[in-house]
UniProtKB/Swiss-Prot annotation:
Residues 291-543 form the Glutamine amidotransferase type-1 domain. UTP binds at S13, K186, T187, K188, P189, T190, Q191, K222. The lineage of its organism: Bacteria, Pseudomonadati, Pseudomonadota, Alphaproteobacteria, Sphingomonadales. Gene3D superfamilies: 3.40.50.880, P-loop containing nucleotide triphosphate hydrolases. CTP binds at S13, D146, I147, E148, K186, T187, K188, P189, T190, Q191, K222. Belongs to the CTP synthase family. This is CTP synthase. Its EC number is 6.3.4.2. Pathway: Pyrimidine metabolism; CTP biosynthesis via de novo pathway; CTP from UDP: step 2/2. It comes from Zymomonas mobilis subsp. mobilis (strain ATCC 31821 / ZM4 / CP4).
Length: 544
């Protein structure tokens, strides 16, 4: 039977529960344990798919087509275990399922209540499909005391009794703020957070204390005394230069040992973390650097492109270079902005990421044109590929009125709504006036690469599988004029109906992909497209 580690947060949000969970999972894996990480999100949205990127950040898509929290990206990158739909649950989805059961009469006339119906649903989710695991780590979103999270806190309290006290450990992440005026670290917020947690019936076994300054031994003893945990289970968590240093820091402070000890597992075998040390060394001691501009719509919140940022870092790791990312608002390239050309001229490569809606689209097209004309390495992802096709249609294929039907009626809809596609041998269909949530082409789909193409060489394969999240696609009826304009359709769906990759053979590095390769990139296994893109940027840096 799997053991469960429940991770809660206190004092403030955004302390890094997700990174802590991912780091702990990685350390347990290095000890040979089989792990899986799950996320409980207390918000009432069914999933984050329809939420604003500025509110939620990135939507992380799994192989099986789930739109999930960005923390699942950290889980997958650190552990290497592909996330699944069953690894993320929201209050919205729980209530949706419960209400559907009530409408069907499944509760046989019983009064449907938070306890036991909601809490039972949460417990079922936590325990589902865990028989082949050693540890299941469950992160509870939000902060202890939030009204929204109370059913989850109650559910994990019950699980300790259901599963047996030796099979559940509670890890609580808090903030130990530094008051500059007094020159002191303050432990009182942590004490109050633990008091709130214990008032709900949960005594934490391990305390992780985020702090900007080293936590003195006397303060650890004080926290241990007032929070009723062993001193060895008070783990300092200082800021790190890179998120890939975090597992090393946590191991040095004894997090994995404290958690195993709380389970009664006293394992003294030294841990070999050479893989993580190698990554840390490459990041700390690069042999060069490149500057890549990301021309996007949501650059005001970098979490909106979290996996993209990490994939570029992974490309830098593969090439032993530091990647400097310049975030550029696409709208600055619309009209005659004298600063626009200057901003692009200083870049070694240009990337246009995914997005939705018309705002900023002309700026993205202008950035594509600059990259094409000035032979700057260009990478278009999802909407970025579509903008590359519109730019090519207008400026190299003679289709001056080319646009996307996403932006309104068009005389030349080079980009159109896809209403049906094939998945696992079956046709999926969507209506133009259907719901927004969960109706896109989501999850992993195969593609066939053109023999001799640049992407076939990069992948070293003719067949690939990548993750998608889109409802618009390059209109196959414009394939011929676009190819006459210099674009090569080097990747297609197996049925030959959906363009997946375009490239320009007359350009040093110009590739557009309809999928999201950043979702599969990992520090120990950088995605080949990002590795090659950064290599192209490095080559460009030596030319300017």
């Amino acid at each position: 039977m799997a053991r469960f580690i429940f991770i809660t947060g206190g004092v403030v949000s955004s302390l890094g529960k997700g990174l802590m969970a991912a780091s702990l999972a990685a350390l347990l894996q290095e000890r040979g344990f089989r792990v899986r990480i799950r996320k409980f999100d207390p918000y009432l949205n069914v999933d984050p798919g329809t939420m604003s990127p500025y509110q939620h950040g990135e939507v992380y898509v799994t192989d099986d087509g789930a739109e999930t929290d960005l923390d699942l990206g950290h889980y997958e990158r650190f552990s290497g275990v592909p996330s699944r739909r069953s690894d993320n649950i929201t209050s919205g989805r729980i209530y949706q399922n419960i209400i559907a059961k009530e409408r069907r009469g499944d509760y046989l006339g019983a009064t449907v209540q938070v306890i036991p119906h909601v809490t039972d649903a949460i417990k079922d989710f936590a325990r589902d499909d865990t028989d082949d695991l050693d540890f299941v780590l469950c992160e509870i979103g939000g902060t202890v005391g939030d009204i929204e999270s109370l059913p989850f806190i109650e559910a994990i309290r019950q699980l300790k009794n259901d599963l047996g006290r030796g099979n559940v450990v509670f890890v609580h992440l808090t903030l130990v703020p530094y008051i500059a005026a007094a020159g002191e670290l303050k432990t009182k917020p942590t004490q109050h957070s633990v008091r709130d947690l214990t008032s709900f019936g949960i005594q934490p076994d391990v305390l992780v204390c985020r702090t900007e300054h080293p936590l003195p031994d006397s303060e650890r003893s004080k926290i241990a005394l007032f929070c009723n945990v062993p001193k060895e289970a008070v783990i300092p968590a200082l800021d790190a230069k890179s998120i890939y240093d975090v597992p090393l820091h946590y191991h040095a402070e004894g997090l994995d040992k404290a958690v195993l000890s709380a389970f009664g597992l006293n394992i003294e075998t030294p841990l070999d973390l050479h893989r993580w040390k190698e990554i840390s060394d490459r990041l700390a001691n690069p042999e060069g650097e490149v500057t890549i501009g990301v021309v996007g719509k949501y650059v005001g919140l970098q979490d909106a492109y979290k996996s993209l940022h990490e994939a570029l870092v992974h490309g830098g790791i593969a090439n032993r270079v530091k990647v400097n990312i310049v975030w550029l608002d696409a709208e600055m390239f619309e009209g005659n902005n004298p600063e626009a050309a200057e901003a692009l001229s200083s870049l070694h490569a240009i990337l246009v990421p995914g997005g939705f809606g018309e705002r900023g689209s002309e700026g993205k097209i202008a950035a594509v044109k600059f990259a094409r004309e000035h032979k700057v390495p260009f990478f278009g992802i999802c909407l970025g590929m579509q903008m590359a096709c519109i730019e090519g249609a207008r400026n190299t294929a003679g289709l001056k009125k080319a646009s996307s039907s996403e932006f309104g009626p068009s005389e030349e809809p080079v980009i159109g709504l896809i209403t049906e596609w094939e998945r696992d041998g079956e046709r999926e269909e969507r209506a133009a006036d259907g719901d927004l949530g969960g109706t896109m082409r989501l999850g992993a789909y195969p593609a066939v690469l053109k023999a001799g193409s640049q992407v076939a060489e990069i992948y070293n394969s003719r067949e690939i599988t990548e993750r998608h999240r889109h409802r618009y696609e390059v209109n196959i009826h414009y394939k011929e004029p676009l190819e006459k304009g210099g674009l090569v359709f080097s990747g297609m769906s197996p049925d030959g109906l959906l363009p997946e990759i375009v490239e320009r053979p007359d350009h040093p590095w110009f590739i557009g992909v309809q999928f999201h390769p950043e979702l599969k990139s990992k520090p120990f296994d950088p995605h080949p497209l990002f590795s090659d893109f950064v290599a192209a940027a490095l080559k460009q840096s030596r030319l300017v």
